[in-house]
Amino acid sequence: MNGTEGPNFYVPFSNKSGVVRSPFEYPQYYLAEPWQYSVLAAYMFLLILLGFPVNFLTLYVTIQHKKLRTPLNYILLNLAFANHFMVFGGFPVTMYSSMHGYFVFGQTGCYIEGFFATMGGEIALWSLVVLAIERYVVVCKPMSNFRFGENHAIMGVMMTWIMALACAAPPLFGWSRYIPEGMQCSCGVDYYTLKPEVNNESFVIYMFLVHFTIPLMIIFFCYGRLVCTVKEAAAQQQESATTQKAEKEVTRMVIIMVVAFLICWVPYASVAFYIFSNQGTDFGPIFMTVPAFFAKSSAIYNPVIYIVLNKQFRNCMITTICCGKNPFGDDETTSAATSKTEASSVSSSQVSPA
């Protein structure tokens, strides 16, 4: 084994030299230079600095503007709330630990931080799945005349929490465990060991299958069908110029959504699966640290892609920031244009970016 396993940790560093210490008690500067830990702390501070205002504005603007309180926006609010889980429940802990070079909050703190980080990430992921299903059902119309209503939105939000709990809660009750990962300043599910005492192998397989592979397949299927439907409608010239413009925006949004999802999560999932499948192989702490910390940036990507690129929401946000005035456009003009689009057979409420 090229790492050192303890009762509640796994350090990716051989202990032949006798320098490995518990990441809950001693600085881990034998894994990386002190300045590298400082870089991690600065990075986490940046995520907090950017993630809090964007996600807070998302919640605040929706409360301020009644026209934004639509069923679909319930899912978007859920997404912003999930990001707050990570920004408040995980990021400050990781930043403070990085400043000290080890996980200073002990094993209990590790479980709390790991739970919040996993919970927030999974709520966000399953929110994207609900959005994908909604777009597919409304635009592709596998069920004729289906209208996404408030009850559907509430059910969707409930599903995201149930699925997130089904992933984040088991390690708290003995199925797998949360341990420090990478440079030992943040916690996640144990991909490093089989740990038969907590049936770790079965949980990791369950997590990758149910909480990563299946959501990814659903997202790709729904948005793949969405793109095909939009292209077919444009080719048949069944829609007005305004609607075709909305369709192009959907195509652009779909590409951004899929690429952002891949950029945020696939590197982390791939490295985690590699480590799990090749236990005992030689890899450094940076190997897991970089994708793990990069995945945390989804707390910023998500609101930018799913909220800010929504024209109506963007106008409302600008109006709120500018104390009731929008210096860049006229809300009424935008609303009129939206109404015209909604009059077509494929309405903007059906095809505009969520």
Swiss-Prot record:
Disulfide bonds: 110-187
Listed Low complexity bias regions: 334-354
InterPro entries registered for this protein in UniProt: GPCR_opsins, GPCR_Rhodpsn, GPCR_Rhodpsn_7TM, Opsin, Retinal_BS, Rhodopsin, Rhodopsin_N
Molecular-function GO term, any one: G protein-coupled photoreceptor activity
Residue intervals annotated with topology Extracellular: 1-36, 97-110, 174-202, 275-286
Entry keyword set: Cell projection, Chromophore, Disulfide bond, G-protein coupled receptor, Glycoprotein, Lipoprotein, Membrane, Palmitate, Phosphoprotein, Photoreceptor protein, Receptor, Retinal protein, Sensory transduction, Transducer, Transmembrane, Transmembrane helix, Vision
Post-translational modification: Contains one covalently linked retinal chromophore. Upon light absorption, the covalently bound 11-cis-retinal is converted to all-trans-retinal. After hydrolysis of the Schiff base and release of the covalently bound all-trans-retinal, active rhodopsin is regenerated by binding of a fresh molecule of 11-cis-retinal.
Cellular component GO terms held in the UniProt record: membrane; photoreceptor disc membrane; plasma membrane
Stretch list, region Disordered: 332-354
GO biological process, one term: G protein-coupled opsin signaling pathway
Residues the record marks as carrying a glycan: 2, 15
Primary localization class, coarse: membrane
Lipid attachment points (S-palmitoyl cysteine): 322-323
Presence of keyword Phosphoprotein: yes
Domain of life: Eukaryota
Short sequence motif named 'Ionic lock' involved in activated form stabilization, residue ranges: 134-136
Gene3D superfamilies linked to this entry: Rhodopsin 7-helix transmembrane proteins
Localization per Swiss-Prot or TrEMBL: Membrane; Cell projection, Cilium, Photoreceptor outer segment
List of residues that carry N6-(retinylidene)lysine: 296
Role according to the record: Photoreceptor required for image-forming vision at low light intensity. Required for photoreceptor cell viability after birth. Light-induced isomerization of 11-cis to all-trans retinal triggers a conformational change that activates signaling via G-proteins. Subsequent receptor phosphorylation mediates displacement of the bound G-protein alpha subunit by arrestin and terminates signaling.
UniProt-recorded name of the protein: Rhodopsin
Native source species: Ambystoma tigrinum
